C-alpha cells in the first residue's frame, strides 16, 4: 500500500460478511462503499480522499477484537463498526483504551457505546422495546401478547426486557414469554404451542430474521396465525433463500428505513445501490451509508485533517458529532447527545405482497428514555 499518497481521513470499517449475520455485513459493506465512492468523487472530506479497509468479524467477539487490532496495525484513524452488539461491546473496550472514534451503524446494546468515544446510528435496544410496545398498544393491534426471544443474545434479551416493562405500563397483557438459546434455535414447537395455548393475539419477535423465518413456518404448520411484530433484526427476511415470503404477509417491524419510501433521497439511494450491487438495500445499508456522511459532516465542522493523530481526531469528532444536525436516509434532523445516542423518528413497516411498506409512526423520539414515557 502506497503510504505516500494523501490518505485523507483513514476511515476504516468492520463488519461481518460471513457467518450467521452475513446479510447484514454485506449490506453494511455495500452501503459504506457507495457513500465513500460518492464522497471521493465529489472531492473527499476537507479536500482529502477517504482511504478505507474492512475486516470480517463473523459476528464473533474474539474475532472482532482480532480484526480491530489488524485495522489498527494498518493505520486506522476511526472506525465504523461493528455490525452486531456482542462484537461491538468487545471492540469498544479496545477503541476506548486507544481513544479512537467509533460509530456503529447497527449495534443496539446499550453497552456497545458505553464510552464517550462511541456513537451509534441505529436505535438502542431499550428504545426498540419500548417503542414496539407503544406502537402495539397505541394502534390497538392486540391486548394479549406473547414474546419469543433469544435469552443468549444481548440484542434480543435487551429488547425483550424493555418491551415487557413498557407493555405493562401500556396495559398490554404478556400472556407468554418463552426463550430459546443459540444452542437450540431450530425447533420452536414448545414456544409456539405456549403462545397458542395462552390465546396470544400477537407474538412479538425481538430476534433476527433467520430464527423468525423458522418460527413463521412452524407456526403455520401448527395452525397458529397471530399477528407478528418484530424489530430491526427482522429486516432481510424477504431476501432469505428458500423462505416462502407469503408466510411473512402482514408481518410488522420497527425500522429506521424502508426502500419503498417516496422521498427523493431514498429513491436516489435505492436506484444507485441497485445499479452498483444489483440488490435492493435494507436498513443496514442505509445505516452504514448515513454513518459515512455523518462523519463527513462532523469532520468538516471540526476541520479534521489526515495528519492529526487518531486520538486528536477522536476528541474533535466527539465534539463535532454533538453539534451537527444531519438529514439522512434513516432519519431527518438527526442529532446526537454526549452519550452517543441519536434522536430520530422510527418507522414501522408491514410486509404486503412480498414487499416492505412503510407505516407512519411519529409517536416516539429515539432518544427518549423509559422515564420520559
PLM features: residue spans?
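Hydrophobic alpha-helical segments within soluble ligand-binding/sensing domains
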Residues: 64, 121-144, 157-159, 185-189, ...
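Extracytoplasmic "Venus flytrap"
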Residues: 7, 14-31, 55-61, 84, ...
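Beta-alpha junction/loop-to-helix N-cap segments that form part of ligand/metal-binding clefts
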Residues: 23-30, 42-112, 121, 180-186, ...
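Periplasmic-binding protein-like
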Residues: 71-83, 103-105, 146-149, 199-209, ...
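Single conserved hydrophobic/aromatic residue that forms the stacking wall/gate
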Residues: 1-13, 363, 370-373
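Segments of small-molecule ligand-sensing domains
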Residues: 275-285, 296-355
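Extracellular/periplasmic periplasmic-binding protein-like sensory domains
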Residues: 216-289, 350
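An alpha-beta-alpha
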Residues: 17, 118-179, 202
Amino acid at each position: 500500500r502506497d503510504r505516500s499518497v494523501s490518505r485523507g481521513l483513514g476511515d476504516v470499517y468492520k463488519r461481518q460478511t460471513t457467518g450467521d449475520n452475513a446479510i447484514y455485513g454485506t449490506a453494511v459493506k455495500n452501503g459504506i462503499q457507495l457513500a465513500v465512492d460518492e464522497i471521493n468523487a465529489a472531492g473527499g472530506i476537507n479536500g482529502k480522499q477517504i482511504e478505507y479497509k474492512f475486516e470480517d468479524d463473523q459476528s464473533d467477539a474474539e474475532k472482532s477484537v482480532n480484526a480491530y487490532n489488524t485495522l489498527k496495525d494498518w493505520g486506522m484513524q476511526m472506525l465504523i463498526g461493528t455490525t452486531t452488539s456482542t462484537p461491538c461491546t468487545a471492540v469498544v473496550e479496545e477503541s476506548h483504551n486507544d481513544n479512537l472514534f467509533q460509530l456503529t451503524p447497527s449495534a443496539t446494546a446499550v453497552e456497545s457505546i458505553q464510552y464517550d468515544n462511541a456513537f451509534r446510528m441505529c436505535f438502542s435496544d431499550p428504545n426498540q422495546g419500548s417503542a414496539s410496545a407503544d406502537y402495539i398498544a397505541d394502534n390497538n393491534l392486540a391486548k394479549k401478547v406473547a414474546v419469543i426471544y433469544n435469552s443468549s443474545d444481548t440484542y434480543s434479551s435487551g429488547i425483550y426486557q424493555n418491551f415487557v416493562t413498557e407493555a405493562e405500563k401500556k396495559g398490554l397483557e404478556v400472556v407468554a414469554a418463552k426463550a430459546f438459546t443459540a444452542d437450540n434455535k431450530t425447533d420452536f414447537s414448545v414456544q409456539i404451542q405456549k403462545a397458542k395455548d395462552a390465546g396470544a393475539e400477537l407474538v412479538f419477535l425481538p430476534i433476527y430474521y433467520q430464527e423468525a423465518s423458522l418460527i413463521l413456518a412452524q407456526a403455520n404448520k401448527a395452525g397458529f396465525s397471530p399477528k407478528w411484530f418484530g424489530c430491526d433484526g427482522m429486516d432481510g427476511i424477504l431476501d432469505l433463500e428458500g423462505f416462502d415470503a407469503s408466510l411473512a404477509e402482514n408481518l410488522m417491524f420497527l425500522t429506521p428505513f424502508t426502500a419503498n419510501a417516496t422521498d427523493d433521497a431514498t429513491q436516489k439511494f435505492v436506484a444507485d445501490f441497485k445499479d452498483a450491487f444489483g440488490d435492493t438495500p435494507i436498513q443496514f445499508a442505509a445505516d452504514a451509508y448515513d454513518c459515512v456522511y455523518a462523519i463527513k459532516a462532523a469532520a468538516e465542522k471540526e476541520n479534521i485533517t489526515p495528519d492529526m493523530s487518531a486520538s486528536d481526531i477522536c476528541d474533535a469528532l466527539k465534539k463535532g458529532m454533538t453539534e451537527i444536525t444531519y438529514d439522512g436516509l434513516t432519519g431527518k434532523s438527526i442529532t446526537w447527545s454526549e452519550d452517543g445516542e441519536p434522536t430520530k423518528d422510527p418507522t414501522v413497516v408491514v410486509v404486503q405482497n412480498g414487499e416492505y411498506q412503510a407505516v407512519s409512526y411519529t409517536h416516539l423520539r429515539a432518544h427518549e428514555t423509559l422515564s420520559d414515557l
